[in-house]
Amino acid sequence: RIDSEVLATIFYAEPARAIGINSIRGDFGALFLAMSLFTLVGSFGSQRWLLIPSVFLVLVIVGRMTSFILDDLPMVLASSLVMELIFLIVLVLALISNYLKSDSTENRSFFRVFFNQRMLIALGTVLVLIMGAFWGHEKIGIGLWNRAVEQRTNQNTIARLSDGLHVGLAGTGAPIPDTKRVGVSTFVIAGSSLFVVDTGPGSTRKLELMQVPLGRIDAVLLTHFHSDHIGDLGELMLKAWTTGARTKPLHVIGPVGVDRVVYGFNQAYALDSDYRTLHHGPTVADSRGAGGVSQSIDLKDKASTAIVFQNADLKVSAFLVDHRPVSSAFGYRFDYKGRSVVISGDTLPDEALRREAQNVDLLLHEVLNPEMLLTMNRAAARSGRNVVRNVTHDILDYHTFPEEAARIARDANARHLVFHHFIPPVPMAILHRAFLGNSRQYFDGPITMGVEGMLFSLPAHSNAIEKGWLLQ
């Protein structure tokens, strides 16, 4: 199933928040320009379809004003709102004019539906409510804050998950700046065990917003040491310590070199850790739990795998993938009570990945669309941005294209393919089909464009793959 929130987020429209209403308008700005022209043309006509832009503009204006109240976005209010109100007034006057001069009984009956006592009372009520919201916004704000805090404190979706494998997307972006996505990070829950795979910039905050209990993390698994995969490690170590009152450092597992990475973050956060202990005391910030402790996995060749965690029901394996010139880059496989997940890490199409993903339920694969990236490359060349031109050329040779990932999923007999770590950014849902290219020609199973907040649940000893949503 796909919850309405998941579907809305795929289209970058968040129905539970006012900013979602504005995001539709922003993402489809051309539609609004067309609507403005439609409004002007329509004001000189006598057609019933004048009601369409009228209703549409009312929704836009309400969305803009609601955003101002709830999301503190005055910058979207001023000039655009004035123009929209002018267009709306012109339309309403045109409608009234058409009604007054209409000789048709049918037309008069049609317009009478919208211009009657009940409709005017309803409109007046809405206006009073909007005005009241502006005048009483302080008391309303305090009330909403108190209610939100109560709901947030008592809500614990993670604790109510059924037994099985649960995979959450806390970050699906890549190094290229993206207004919609943060650095790549995925959490995996298997029974009582919790793992975080990679900690891209900004992902710790997403984990917190998804109410992942950071203090319970068993281990952080790093695929490799590019900055977009480790940038938030220090923040994650700090938050796991202070929000969970840990008395042991966070366990960080990765390829050879992880010792240097963890040591560096420990040093960078050492003074902060001292301050926390002095301020909060050992009950909250016991110095024994600060920072991280590393475990290095040395895989010699593609034929090898390493078991990095195992108990009676769960096995977590690491395997080498091809992300040269990175000397050691890992993918990870999780097997729990008949369910399985593979996270590719950054890689070219790779036989080891194809082997390790055999019959997997869920394959999370990084992805790069070459045509879109080359468009950026050519634009950078034309504008003289040589660094961007060089980078967008160089990264073509160590990532996987959508069609290649689809073939891997097909050859491995994967049941569901999820794309993340998008290069270049995909700012609008309307671009999804173009980004996927011909992927669906090679893999006939479900393909999902990952979004922060998505949760994939694989109940133990079943075939179900359920989609949920963890961002409020």
What are the roles of these predicted feature ranges?
Residues 46-56:
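Membrane-interfacial loop-to-transmembrane alpha-helix junctions, especially the N-terminal start
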Residues 103-341, 430-463, 471:
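Binuclear metal-dependent hydrolase catalytic cores
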Residues 87-104:
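Membrane-water interface at the C-terminal end of transmembrane alpha helices
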Residues 107-133, 331, 340-342, 348-452:
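Cap/insert and terminal regions of metallo-dependent hydrolase folds
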Residues 1-18:
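Hydrophobic transmembrane helix segments
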Residues 56-66:
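Aromatic-anchored segments of alpha-helical transmembrane domains
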Residues 73-84:
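Non-cytosolic membrane-interface motifs at loop->transmembrane helix junctions
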Residues 19-40, 55:
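Core segments of alpha-helical transmembrane spans in multipass integral membrane proteins
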